[in-house]
């Protein structure tokens, strides 16, 4: 179940029954009991606190952002046509963005989207004007774009190293 933190309390209560008793009660139909114990994966972006009862029934696994080497491999596999130097620069730039005080750090999927966009634009290297014109692909809040703007030149320079 993707992004459980975006669900409401009623859905959490529904999940508790599934995870505790391996059954679902539907007023119009009755109780349906599972033949086998389900294996359920929940993902969360931490946009709200999940109830303690649900947390007790789950194992927690935190997956951090990938290091630059792994992120380059991910970009290569998802955007194989990207220029090698652009890929390195793009990954270093995004890694630098993630060090800023942003409301929402750019995810790997947003990095992939940005890489695809830059390939479609036939970009070979990051330039300040281009980055400013496409930053909304990476950053989803105007406040984050505003925070990033004064750092763009420095981030581009650092990404070339």
Protein language model annotation of sequence segments:
Residues 1-161:
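C-terminal regulatory/interaction module of P-loop NTP-utilizing enzymes
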